[in-house]
Amino acid sequence: MIFSQVFWFTGLSGVGKTTVANSVKEYFVQKGQHVLVLDGDNVRHELHRHLGFSLSEIKKNNLLIAKLCQKHRHETNIIFVPIISPYRESRSLARSMLNPGFYEIHFDADMDTLCKRDTKGLYKLAQKGEMKNLIGFSAKNV
């Protein structure tokens, strides 16, 4: 029976979590492994679009993604979860639900680098005051 390892990639928007997850996925797929990427943005858009970005809604989205990991754990060898996951409480809950085999990996870059990358245009919006509570820019990441 398969029991996958879960790699919970955390970090601010634009730091490279999804890029790394997709690259590493391709490596393992070429080695014959079954790999699933549960990207936080994609899962939110496809399954949890009713959720906003308040503290409670972010925590709920993290919980629902951890439950998706549990659901798919016996179907794949590796699950990569690139997600901002800004709250320690949510990461601890995911760890308790998914241990053993849960690995939290934090990605980091300075704000200048993130603002230069800004692949989604979020930092530009935040700088202009058009986006409130961008995690790491105007909202806490704890």
Regions found by a protein language model. Name each.
Residues S54-N99, Y123-L125, N133-L134:
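Glycine-rich phosphate-binding loop used to anchor ATP phosphates in small-molecule kinases
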Residues L12:
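P-loop (Walker A) phosphate-binding loop of NTP-binding proteins
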Residues D108-M111, K116-V142:
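Small-molecule kinase domains that catalyze NTP-dependent phosphoryl transfer to phosphate-bearing small molecules
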Residues F102-F107:
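Conserved beta-strand/loop subsegment of P-loop NTPase cores
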Residues F7-F9:
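Hydrophobic anchor at the beta1->P-loop junction of P-loop NTPases
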Residues M1-S4:
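Phosphate-binding P-loop
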Residues V15, A21-H72:
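Conserved substrate/cofactor phosphate-moiety recognition/catalytic segment
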Residues N42-R44, S85-R88, D108-T113:
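Conserved nucleotide-binding/hydrolysis micro-motifs of P-loop NTPases
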